[in-house]
């Protein structure tokens, strides 16, 4: 695919999967905008400070991109947080944080770009799901709730906007070597008094491929989902999890 002059917004693209996707799209010739609260430390794309928990910040950031570029071709709504806790261990504040960022932040980001893509009569959107969009895991009640919601948001939005040639798909990674994973590992190690290396090794052994994934491996799938080469695919939840959910 010719990526030249394609304009893409990625939320949460300073670290992890968002960063890997930003770098890959930039290297392929895209004009990339990173909406994040922490600025990236390289020159691969433009940074706009945006906390996706704020509806107004999202709308202002999208307006800033559209004013400059006159179009928005693609969106990867990636920003999110993880929480390793069961229901009794979860505070009211943590529930609010996860729902506001993972669900509402995604919803309002998509809502802000949809009118632009409708006017263009074309657009491609990828939402960040999880293996927990398909299966349950222990100590993940609120996080799993948010990722199940993202799966349904993907399907409903895909149906609503297919007549406008806007495709909406969902990438559902498994266990990936990101800062979010290491925070979860740290918390689990603290709770269980197990060494962090032991926890990480246990994560490797439960994957059919025998290892956790790398951000670049997910970025390559996201890039395909965003691309015009994927023009007949919409409303799909795509696993990239080393075979975890098929066990």
Predicted regions and their residues:
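Active-site loop immediately N-terminal to the catalytic Tyr-X3-Lys motif
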Residues: 88, 135-141, 163-164, 210, ...
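Short, small/polar-rich loop/turn modules that mediate ligand/substrate recognition or access, typified
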Residues: 162, 167, 233-235
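Substrate-binding pocket helix/loop in short-chain dehydrogenase/reductase
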Residues: 86-87, 91-99, 189, 203
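Active-site helix of classical SDR
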Residues: 110, 146, 154
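Residue(s) in the substrate-gating loop at a strand-loop-helix junction
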Residues: 130
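Conserved glycine-rich cofactor-binding loop
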Residues: 14-15
């Amino acid at each position: 695919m010719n990526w030249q002059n394609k304009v893409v917004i990625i939320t949460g693209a300073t670290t992890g999967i968002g960063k890997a996707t930003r770098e890959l799209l930039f290297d392929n010739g895209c004009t990339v905008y990173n909406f994040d609260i922490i600025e990236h430390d390289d020159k691969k794309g433009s940074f706009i400070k945006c906390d996706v928990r704020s509806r107004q910040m999202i709308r202002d950031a999208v307006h800033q991109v559209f004013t400059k570029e006159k179009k928005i071709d693609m969106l990867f709504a990636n920003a999110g947080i993880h929480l390793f806790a069961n229901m009794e261990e979860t505070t009211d504040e943590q529930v609010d944080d996860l729902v506001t960022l993972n669900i509402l932040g995604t919803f309002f980001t998509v809502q802000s770009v949809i009118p632009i893509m409708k006017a263009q009569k074309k657009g491609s959107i990828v939402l960040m799901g999880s293996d927990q969009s398909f299966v349950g895991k222990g100590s993940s009640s609120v996080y799993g709730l948010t990722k199940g919601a993202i799966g349904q948001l993907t399907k409903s939005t895909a149906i609503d906007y297919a007549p406008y040639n806007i495709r909406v798909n969902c990438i559902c990674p498994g266990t990936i070597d990101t800062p979010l994973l290491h925070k979860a590992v740290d918390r689990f190690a603290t709770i269980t008094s197990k060494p962090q290396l032991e926890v990480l090794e246990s994560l490797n052994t439960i994957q059919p491929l025998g290892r956790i994934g790398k951000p670049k491996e997910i970025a390559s799938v996201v890039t395909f989902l965003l691309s015009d080469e994927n023009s007949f695919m919409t409303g799909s939840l795509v696993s990239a999890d080393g075979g975890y959910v098929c066990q």
